[in-house]
Amino acid sequence: MLILNQRTQQLATDSVALAYDERKRSRLKVTLASGAEAGIFLERGDHLHGGDKLAAEDGSAVVEILAAPEKLIEAIADSPLLFARAAYHLGNRHVPVQILPTENGGKLRFQTDHVLAEMVRGLGCSVSDAEAPFQPESGAYGGGHHHGDESATDLHNPGHGPHRSVPKIHEFKPR
């Protein structure tokens, strides 16, 4: 079994498609597109994004991480104000959200949760089911990618209580 534990920018020799919940895990056994078995071993709190590449410990392979399509809720706001309200209410609940532009307002994608879908519908968004790769925003406590020398934090740890981590300024990078 290949051991994938080093980030790299080298050209990929194989790939694996992972859903968001899988990309959040620091330890994961996967089957690559080639059929080979591999183990992903990352620092705790380190998360993968579609497009990331991991090198095998023995240097024999470079695997590109693909964001697998998954079932999501898509909320479309037809004005900037409605978009801001919907994003605020989802963010206030610490919901991982992918933000996408539209001509008039914006589009929010989040994991399937019918209570949240009804909430944003009640705010005035048009809501539908979608199947797409999910690449949510990292958030204030998630930072960007972690590359070993940076402190690792959990995207779902809002930083409350005595374990509170130092907030990081958002890193807005093209994906």
Curated annotation (Swiss-Prot):
It is found in: Cytoplasm. HAMAP family: UreE (MF_00822). Gene3D superfamilies: Urease metallochaperone UreE, N-terminal domain, UreE, C-terminal domain. It comes from the Bacteria. GO terms for molecular function: nickel cation binding; unfolded protein binding. One of its GO terms (biological process) is urea metabolic process. The keyword Chaperone applies. GO terms for cellular component: cytoplasm. CDD domains: UreE. Belongs to the UreE family. Involved in urease metallocenter assembly. Binds nickel. Probably functions as a nickel donor during metallocenter assembly. Residues 134-175 are annotated as: Disordered. Keywords: Chaperone, Cytoplasm, Nickel, Nickel insertion. The gene is ureE. Its main location: cytoplasm. This is Urease accessory protein UreE.
